């Protein structure tokens, strides 16, 4: 990978754009996930598109309206819609309705656990259904902004206004509250289970060290952070929201406390979405002008995957072994890169 300094034109970056298989989906995309050899592009409305290695497209209807959220564990893509349904689609394209809100409220957030459990939210209520089919719910102080399962144990983090709630659905007792003023819109546990980080409505992140609830202020962004991704092994948390990829260090016992983040792949426009390679210290970053870069985190070396002059990048994902990258912009122009 070659290096380009701040503002160094795209012509100075080594290009692998000729290795991308273009895919025209013809409709907006909100996220992309891999199920076996297929890239599954989640549309903004009603359906998902399965795209094979050759770029052939097959559509699967999943919702009777807008798709508001989606996650995947590599076995299924689970989505929530404004039709009040939580829907799963598997690698064979089989669709199953997992839950329907009794009041047909919008499903704002979904999360998946490794043992088959899943969570979803409608309004102020978070629901968990275990792998054995047992369902529990918890009401939090305000509308749920994000959900995430801890990497160990059945523990759910629920982001909301003025903080986050940590809930063990299988245990009695009061859930733990982590407070921080402002609206929290996304949430993630560090892979080692030691830290919790929320993305805020304002241009900042906020973190807590779970052992002692110590605060970690992660500010200085010019725009809201809409995308967060942990690097292989959880050493860094890469984020969008600035005119470079901001990567916060989490390898030490104090995480990013008292440390400056790395600033990778600077461009004159903001990063909109980030995705970390599952096995190596490499990330992919998409930008407002349609650029996609692959970045080596060790030294900032860059490869150009997609040139500028396109709509903002909306979705990025690696497959399980990191041999393929899928992307799409806000208008549905997509691509597959084989490495």
Describe the function of each predicted region.
Residues 1-339:
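WD40-repeat beta-propeller superdomains and closely related acidic/aromatic-rich repeat-like regions
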């Amino acid at each position: 990978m070659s290096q380009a300094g701040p503002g160094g034109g795209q012509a100075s970056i080594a290009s692998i754009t000729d290795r991308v298989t273009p895919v025209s989906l013809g409709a907006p995309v909100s996220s992309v996930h891999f199920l076996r050899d297929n890239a599954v592009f989640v549309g903004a409305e009603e359906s998902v598109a399965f795209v094979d290695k050759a770029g052939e497209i097959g559509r699967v209807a999943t919702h009777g309206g807008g798709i508001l959220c989606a996650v995947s564990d590599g076995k299924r893509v689970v989505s929530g819609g404004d039709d009040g349904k939580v829907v799963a689609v598997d690698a064979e394209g089989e669709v199953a309705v997992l839950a329907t809100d009794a009041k047909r409220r919008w499903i704002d957030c979904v999360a998946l656990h490794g043992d088959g459990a899943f969570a979803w939210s409608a309004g102020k209520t978070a629901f968990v259904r275990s792998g054995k089919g047992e369902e529990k719910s918890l009401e939090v102080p305000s509308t749920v902004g994000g959900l995430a399962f801890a990497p160990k144990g059945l523990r759910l983090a629920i982001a909301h206004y003025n903080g986050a709630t940590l809930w063990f659905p299988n245990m009695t007792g009061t859930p733990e509250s982590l407070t921080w003023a402002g609206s929290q819109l996304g949430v993630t546990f560090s892979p080692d289970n030691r830290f919790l980080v929320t993305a805020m409505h304002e241009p900042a992140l906020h973190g807590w060290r779970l052992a002692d609830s110590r605060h970690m202020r992660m500010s200085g962004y010019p725009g809201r952070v809409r995308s967060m991704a942990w690097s292989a092994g959880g050493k860094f948390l890469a984020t969008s929201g600035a005119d470079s990829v901001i990567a916060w260090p989490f390898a030490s016992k104090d995480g990013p406390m008292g440390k400056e983040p790395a600033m990778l792949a600077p461009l004159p426009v903001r990063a909109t979405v980030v995705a970390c390679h599952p096995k190596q210290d490499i990330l992919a970053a998409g930008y407002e002008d349609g650029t996609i870069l692959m970045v080596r985190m060790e030294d900032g070396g860059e490869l150009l995957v997609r040139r500028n002059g396109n709509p903002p990048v909306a979705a990025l994902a690696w497959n399980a072994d990191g041999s393929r990258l899928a992307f799409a912009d806000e208008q549905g122009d997509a691509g597959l890169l084989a490495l």
